[in-house]
Amino acid sequence: MAEKTEKPTAKKLRDAAKKGQTFKARDIVALIVIATGALAAPALVDLTRIAAEFVRIASTGAQPNPGAYAFAWAKLFLRIAAPFVLLCAAAGALPSLVQSRFTLAVESIRFDLTALDPVKGMKRLFSWRSAKDAVKALLYVGVFALTVRVFADLYHADVFGLFRARPALLGHMWIVLTVRLVLLFLLCALPVLILDAAVEYFLYHRELKMDKHEVKQEYKESEGNHEIKSKRREIHQELLSEEIKANVEQSDFIVANPTHIAIGVYVNPDIVPIPFVSVRETNARALAVIRHAEACGVPVVRNVALARSIYRNSPRRYSFVSHDDIDGVMRVLIWLGEVEAANRGGPPPETRAPTSAEPQARDGVAPPGDACADNAFPDDAPPGAAAPNAGSPDGPAPDGGAPARTGDQNA
């Protein structure tokens, strides 16, 4: 059997709580209940009402009906004791719920025959918790003796004064002295209560410790097999990227960071002359956008400054490019037109943004509506012509050929 050296996980603690195995500092709960009762007793328990009832019966001199007499005493008892009992019950229930983290132990209500097992009973009898309870009992005996000694030194005059007290004040004095004795005992027992709670917490976690195999098995049950989880993640990302793929294919170009940010830009002056952010992805999705754009022939421009600026100034997808970034976007569009003209071997186009209505303006790049078409490169394209992917808007290469690959464009 493997040695249990690992701390219990959160799931292990939750499952144990459902079975009733929670950290319980019962003595602290008892301390709260006793302190609440001692402080509330003088205000809630009115013994003068009992004395007044005796006086009323004696003054009438009549023989009361036994049934009515018992019913009257029962009502009087409930009126006096009910508020006190309810307050003490609430004072005991609230700390218990806090210790169990408001978890109801449903499984602990079931009848369990294993609790009658004599072998387990002997193990509990000679367990660390039993030894702790025995030491705690001895400490409480010492605390009680200390409490009596301190109480006698402090209030012996009041105790002996009870013999000379008036009957009307006798009940009140007894209540006051009893409350003082109880509070003094709780104060002296406080160190023992704290020590008991610390030891109980240690034993609770010691009983729920796990071995390494249990931790791995629980991780597999809660998180699933690593290979299956990775496959699910890939499928999920693939399903989510269908819309993004369509937006990439319809973009005029992709500006990259080069690996952490990918921004798709779409321009159609016939509709609105302002560039439009069609794709806005980061990290792994940005790399996927770049790969898909290169596969479909959509230009990819690696410009760190422009990509970061658009990402910062255009916080949402399907929003217009910020006024501060329009100049940089238009420069890229003009450069793309020059690259296409150089690939065709013709004169450079006019210095304006290409539109989706003019697909013939860019050889090697499919129009926004058909970016992945098979005729992305026309038959009359010069040998060696290439789509303007991962290029740089530095202008066409000499002699009207394809532009030289100058690497990333970092503004």
From Swiss-Prot:
Location of this chain's protein in the cell: Cell membrane
GO cellular component terms given for this protein: plasma membrane
GO biological process, one term: protein secretion
Membrane topology listed for this record: Multi-pass membrane protein
Biased composition (Low complexity): 370-404
Gene3D superfamilies, alphabetized: 6.10.250.2080, secretion proteins EscU
Spans annotated as Disordered: 341-411
Keywords for this protein: Cell membrane, Membrane, Transmembrane, Transmembrane helix, Virulence
TM regions (residue ranges): 28-48, 80-100, 137-157, 175-195
Function: Part of the bsa type III secretion system, is involved in the intracellular replication of invading bacteria inside the host cell. Probably necessary for the lysis of the vacuole membrane and escape into the host cell cytoplasm.
Similarity field: Belongs to the type III secretion exporter family.
Protein name (database record): Secretion apparatus protein BsaZ
